[in-house]
Amino acid sequence: MMTVFISCRTLHSGMQKPAPLPAFDKEGHRGARGLMPENTIPGMLKAIDMDLTTLEMDLQITADRQVILSHDNHINPAFTLTGEGKEISEEDAKKRTFYKMNFDQVKSFDVGTKFYDKYPKQQKLKVHIPLLSEVIDSVQTYLAVTGKPQVFYNIETKSSAAGDNLYHPEPNVFIKLVMDVVEGKKITPWTIIQSFDVRTLQVLHDKYPHVRSSFLVEQGSLKDNLQTLGFTPSIYSPAAKLVTAGLVKEVQAKGMKIIPWTVNEKQEIDRLEALGVDGIITDYPDLFNQ
């Protein structure tokens, strides 16, 4: 039965047309960061268990050109231990840049055992920084086994002009490495590429126009931000503090979805839903059920 489910999804993903987005998109930030180690396979599966419709994640590139999940461009000592369970100093952690390490080295770190005081509700377990391909395989298999509906992948390219060839490759290479995995795993119809870096979104729009894009913004007006980007993305993803009734109407009038980040209070979720947003990104998926 599992083979049947997977083969059906593989067949359908060959059609490059994007799948319809959920009526209201419930997104788990870095999986389910408030409840599980961030950007890990267990975190993504937890989000699925909680009936989220989209898995949000961050990407970095290793020295051997592997696509991995991590928000930071180097080891984060706040929640990372060596494979032997030893602490890592901040000074040492900053030297351990992923773009200068091969994946075999990256995989040796434990990002799930150490208590993370910012997220005290996190379940603790020994887990490694995964490849994007590992995450996709695990998610697709889990969906097949559990019978849960197909989820979307909201994938952020963590890049900036200042970091080119220092912390990550240039945008055209970054996007190609990511899309090689996405297309190879045949999840293109359920993929959204998001970024604060307009350059990666511009490359995506030029070379992969069939793939949905999401423009992350933290400040500025809609008009100015879209002018900087140079095209109209599928999704406009502002910081929650920027969202007003007027912005929601303006974004939707241009044919975009509006999905704010990162909303970790039930009262704020209720406010945004009342304004008519198309989805919400949160660290705490359990808030949707309260």
Regions found by a protein language model. Name each.
Residues 1-5:
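Bacterial N-terminal signal peptides
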Residues 6-290:
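Phosphate-group recognition and catalysis centered on beta-loop-alpha active-site segments
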